[in-house]
Structures are given as C-alpha cells and as structure tokens.
Amino acid sequence: PYEKIGAELVKEVAKKTDDVAGDGTTTATVLAQALVKEGLRNVAAGANPLSLKRGIEKAVEKVTETLLKSAKEVETKEQIAATAAISAGDQSIGDLIAEAMDKVGNEGVITVEESNTFGL
C-alpha cells in the first residue's frame, strides 16, 4: 500500500511542477522518488514519520531560499536566447524563441505546435 501512495505522490509532484513551471518534471520526479524511497527506508528503520516530514519541510524551505537568492532575471533578447537554447539544447531554437518573445512582449502568448512536415 505504501508503494501505491508513493507512486501517486510522485505523479502529483510531476503534474504540479508542469502546471506551475511548465518544465522540470523529470528533476521533480527523480527528487520525489528519492524522498519517498529514503523516507520509507527511514521509517522502516524506526524514524518518526512526523519528524521526518518536518525535516523535509525545513530542507525544502532552505533549498527554495538558496535558489531564489541565486536566481537571475532574464530580460534581454540575448539572455532569453541563451536560456532557451540551453533548455532546448539548440541555439537556433533559442534564437527563434527569443525572436518570438521579442515580437509578442512579456504578456504575449506563443503557441508551439507539432508539425508532420520536416524542416518547417
């Protein structure tokens, strides 16, 4: 029964990550799986589940704080292109995304559709 709860938790983490950030579901899933695995191992070894939960919550707060401190605003077209290129693994896609964002502005919407036509 615990494995099913863990699987549901991991699934929910991936969904929430996708809803909030639109990216990072693989990282979130790997972290959630590790937390569930190690959490179950610690509880089986006699750890107090509530203490474990509080420890995880404190760790999440600290990690969030650290990430927010190191976060950088992405403002220029060049920064957008560089960030998008890293995410896509392709500089030309990064440039294309930066160009699209430059045209629609910060509040604009960009829709990406899959095409069956190669090269278009």
UniProtKB/Swiss-Prot annotation:
It catalyses: ATP + H2O + a folded polypeptide = ADP + phosphate + an unfolded polypeptide. Its main location: cytoplasm. The keyword Iron-sulfur does not apply. GO terms for biological process: protein refolding. GO terms for molecular function: ATP binding; ATP-dependent protein folding chaperone; isomerase activity. Keywords: ATP-binding, Chaperone, Cytoplasm, Isomerase, Nucleotide-binding, Stress response. Its EC number is 5.6.1.7. Signal peptide: none annotated. ATP binds at D23, G24, T25, T26, T27. GO terms for cellular component: cytoplasm. It is found in: Cytoplasm. InterPro entries: Cpn60/GroEL (IPR001844), Cpn60/GroEL/TCP-1 (IPR002423), GROEL-like_equatorial_sf (IPR027413), TCP-1-like_intermed_sf (IPR027410). It is an enzyme of class 5 (isomerase). Forms a cylinder of 14 subunits composed of two heptameric rings stacked back-to-back. Interacts with the co-chaperonin GroES. Together with its co-chaperonin GroES, plays an essential role in assisting protein folding. The GroEL-GroES system forms a nano-cage that allows encapsulation of the non-native substrate proteins and provides a physical environment optimized to promote and accelerate protein folding. PANTHER family: 60 KDA HEAT SHOCK PROTEIN, MITOCHONDRIAL (PTHR45633). Belongs to the chaperonin (HSP60) family. This is Chaperonin GroEL.
